[in-house]
């Protein structure tokens, strides 16, 4: 259990360390038991990942527990389109199980990102026009997390490379080695490259 569970473990470590350095208390794997709104803010009662109960008074609460697809009123069941947890199931060419029906964007799952949806739209229209040349490899969709320090990634994480049994090398360069980062006073972080040894 860590902050940024979908990002590379090294990234999560740097972000958590930066948060703690700024005095941010970090709790992961918590289960919220009660949130009581008061004039001064919100009183929270929650259990941490070890089952220990904590109470915390905060000004505001931001709940970031994911997003749900908005596909309920599309009549997908009447058309026989298969969904999984509300997302429309598609192949690498954005085709559903029903001939002639495609799906792109958030309703089709994967990363819920605007630039991913735009690319899916292009791939889908090319396929419909008979000019499709390939599908989408979701490993090549860039991601970012807006925090300080910022996190950006594309491709597989080190953990994913290990799980896939890839023969890979890791290259890592400290952010503090970049003059602009030093000049800006933002030296936390690194650049990390996971390279398949075949290439």
Predicted features, each with a name:
Residues 106-113, 147, 176-184:
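Glycine-rich phosphate/pyrophosphate-binding beta-alpha loops
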Residues 1-54, 111-118, 124-160:
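Rossmann-like dinucleotide-binding cores of NAD(P)H-dependent redox enzymes
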Residues 46-51, 92, 195-197:
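Short acidic, glycine-rich loop/turn motifs
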Residues 54-80, 153-199:
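C-terminal catalytic lobe of FAD-dependent flavoproteins
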Residues 37-42, 98, 184-189:
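A short, glycine/Asx- and small/polar-enriched loop/turn
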Residues 55-130:
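FAD-site-proximal beta/loop scaffold in flavoenzymes
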């Amino acid at each position: 259990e860590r902050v940024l569970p979908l990002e590379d473990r090294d990234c999560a470590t740097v972000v958590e360390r930066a948060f703690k350095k700024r005095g941010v208390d970090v709790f992961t794997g918590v289960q919220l038991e009660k949130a009581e709104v008061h004039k001064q803010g919100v009183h929270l009662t929650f259990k941490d990942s070890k089952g220990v109960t904590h109470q915390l008074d905060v000004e505001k609460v931001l709940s970031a527990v994911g997003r749900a697809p908005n596909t309920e009123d599309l009549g997908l069941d009447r058309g026989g389109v298969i969904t999984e947890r509300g997302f429309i199931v598609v192949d690498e060419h954005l085709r559903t199980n029903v001939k002639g029906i495609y799906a792109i964007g958030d309703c089709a799952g994967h990363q819920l990102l605007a630039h991913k949806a735009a690319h899916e739209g292009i791939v889908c229209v090319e396929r419909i026009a008979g000019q499709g040349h390939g599908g989408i490899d979701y490993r090549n969709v860039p991601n970012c997390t807006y925090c300080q320090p910022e996190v950006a990634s594309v491709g597989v994480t080190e953990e994913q490379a290990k799980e896939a049994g890839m023969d890979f090398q890791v290259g890592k360069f400290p952010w503090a080695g970049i003059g602009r980062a030093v000049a800006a006073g933002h030296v936390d972080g690194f650049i990390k490259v996971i390279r398949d040894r075949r290439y």
